[in-house]
Swiss-Prot record:
UniProt-recorded name of the protein: Large ribosomal subunit protein uL24
Keyword terms of this UniProt record: Ribonucleoprotein, Ribosomal protein, RNA-binding, rRNA-binding
Organism: Synechococcus sp. (strain JA-2-3B'a(2-13)) (Cyanobacteria bacterium Yellowstone B-Prime)
Transmembrane segments: none
GO molecular function ontology, one term from the record: structural constituent of ribosome
Amino acid sequence: MVRPLKPSQIRRLVRRPGIRKHRNSLRYKMRIKQGDTVQVISGDDKGKIGEVLRVFPERNMVLVEGVNIVTYHRKPQREGESGRIETKEAPIPVCKVMAYSKKQEVASRIGYQITADGRKVRVLKKTGEILD
């Protein structure tokens, strides 16, 4: 006779995509930082410009203001409370955004340069504008 599996055993068998939780989880090198202005270069929101609100290096994703808006239908939590519809930004892969220069209104890749005082700074390759 075969015994049914416990929920904890089922969880171990089913592989779920997502973040690895152990200490040595993979972190991607992010050239885009929080507060940068970026332009979306592919996908449904192509051409939109926004500020990076948050960076997720372990998932290789960024949260951009006004981009990838998702809708949540919330059930009422307490008696007498009505349900509601919420909209908010969802993260998008960092490969779908490019740093954007507000001065010259052009998107560009990011490079690095050593300044005269020895600091390593991020630079827009098309315009030469320093980001840091």
